[in-house]
């Protein structure tokens, strides 16, 4: 299915393009490739649409972090995440953005004003990019689909902690709730 966009009603949502997340060992795409592809997408979408960056952040002592019992919990650094680690990747920031959404869980929709901001801007289609493919990106894609947005995932502008995690999400989950495409195809459809 070929892509067609109404660029005035399209937003790029970049999940957690922060130094600490992009500093992790990512696969299948290294952080520099993810950041470069995000910048290409932002350059194509921003002239008529909207670019939104999300950031994961927590209050002192992680009082607002989830603490439910699980078998494999996310380990957060004792004493908090340093400010430099929370900062956005400079390649992504240089591409420009319109809004920042702070989130405290995987999905950019849950507990944030993302849906409100998208609807007030007349957004009907979202393009997703960022890290981690099978956590923040997938959770946001699921919620976007449930909120009746058309979802496009830029596969090569996403990555995860392992190729197997990324590929399962992109090949098994995302096609049921989104269109999964390469950055170049999305950029071409926006021109």
What are these regions (language model features)?
Residues 1-99, 189-191:
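Active-site acidic carboxylates
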Residues 47-49, 122, 148:
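Glycine-centered short loops/turns at secondary-structure junctions
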Residues 82-131:
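Internal catalytic-core helix/loop-beta-alpha segment
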Residues 127-130, 148-163:
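A short glycine-rich beta-strand->turn/loop micro-motif centered on a GG-aromatic cluster
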Residues 137-147:
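Short Gly/Thr/Asp-enriched flexible loops that form oxyanion-binding sites at enzyme active sites
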Residues 162-175:
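Active-site-proximal loop->helix
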Residues 177-191:
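A charged, well-structured terminal subsegment
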